[in-house]
Amino acid sequence: MAILLVMALIMFSLDKCYSTDDKCEDSLRREIACAKCRDRVRTDDYFMNVAHLNLHLKSVRRCCTNDLHCFLRYKTSEM
């Protein structure tokens, strides 16, 4: 009986792992996008302080604010 219980737990954990695989990939893609966004925000701050390149800043802000979750996550982590 204990062996059946252990086997059921193993099968349940494997099934749970495989069923959440897509969510994990989406999360990984989101993390990569956030990293790119974070780099662009840093570039944005650099150019704002150094050269005032308005066209560059507008394109950077548009990219980052399109993914509002990412943008807010990065900005709140700085505080």
UniProtKB/Swiss-Prot annotation:
Entry keywords, A to Z: Disulfide bond, Secreted, Signal, Toxin
Main location per the UniProt record: secreted
Annotated signal sequence range: 1-19
Superkingdom per UniProt: Eukaryota
Post-translational modification: Contains 3 disulfide bonds.
An example Gene Ontology molecular-function term: toxin activity
GO cellular component: extracellular region
Tissue: Expressed by the venom gland.
Protein localization: Secreted
Assigned protein family: Belongs to the scoloptoxin-03 family.
Protein's name according to its UniProt entry: U-scoloptoxin(03)-Sa1a
